[in-house]
Amino acid sequence: MRLAVNIDHIATLRNARNEGHPDPVEAALLAEKHGAAGIVCHLREDRRHIKDDDLARLREEITTKLDLEMAMTDEMQKIALSVRPDLVTLVPEKREELTTEGGFAIQKHFTRLTEFVKPLRDKEIGVSVFIEPEEEAIELAAEAGANIVEFHTGTYSLCTSDKQTAYELERIRNSARIAREMGLTVVAGHGLSVLNIAPFKELHDIEEVSIGHAIISRAVFIGLPAAIQEILDLIRR
């Protein structure tokens, strides 16, 4: 199983002082050096952490793959077509939220999604949709032209009992199998950490996990390389 590291909150820390450090690009290069298979950044409409210049520099400097999380807007599509990340992950976005709070409302926005995906795929940019692990959402993502789905694991991460945890894991497992049978690459992310990631090692239809806040917050105490290694030790098959 691969690990993609989200470096948004390196930028959050930098922006607290509006100075140049810590540099998210430097963090991305360090993450790659220590085992990250990809770098994730979310260019929000309000630019609350990652800035346009960060994205441009990431595209120039990283050597694994660049996953640009973004809202489904004309502005973001234009940026993606210009910067040419390896893939984009389409996420719901609300200005008042602290972090992405759930999966993309794919049923509601299906027609627009289909139109939005095509120019990106025509430029050989992979398209992932951040969805709940549900069969209908998977089918619609594939029908819209996405080649990747990322399952929102926030519900799983908030489970407070063994029964709840087992139910959510089985829901994710079954959804991953369905997605793989449709030819989609399957990623999982949101709320994953050293406290709850271990069972994902056995979910063989999930190829990659995307983790940001848990790694960056842990890195404050033990350093970024060690924080990444903790996760890798738990997910390597």
From Swiss-Prot:
UniProtKB keywords: Cytoplasm, Pyridoxine biosynthesis, Transferase
Function in brief: Catalyzes the complicated ring closure reaction between the two acyclic compounds 1-deoxy-D-xylulose-5-phosphate (DXP) and 3-amino-2-oxopropyl phosphate (1-amino-acetone-3-phosphate or AAP) to form pyridoxine 5'-phosphate (PNP) and inorganic phosphate.
InterPro entries: Aldolase_TIM, PyrdxlP_synth_PdxJ, Pyridoxine-5'_phos_synth
Molecular function per GO: pyridoxine 5'-phosphate synthase activity
Annotated localization: Cytoplasm
Organism annotation: Chlorobaculum tepidum (strain ATCC 49652 / DSM 12025 / NBRC 103806 / TLS)
Entry GO CC: cytosol
Marked site: Transition state stabilizer: 150
Oligomer status and interactors: Homooctamer; tetramer of dimers.
Name of the protein this chain belongs to: Pyridoxine 5'-phosphate synthase
Catalysed transformations (reactions): 3-amino-2-oxopropyl phosphate + 1-deoxy-D-xylulose 5-phosphate = pyridoxine 5'-phosphate + phosphate + 2 H2O + H(+)
Binding sites annotated in the UniProt record for 1-deoxy-D-xylulose 5-phosphate: 8-9, 44, 49, 99
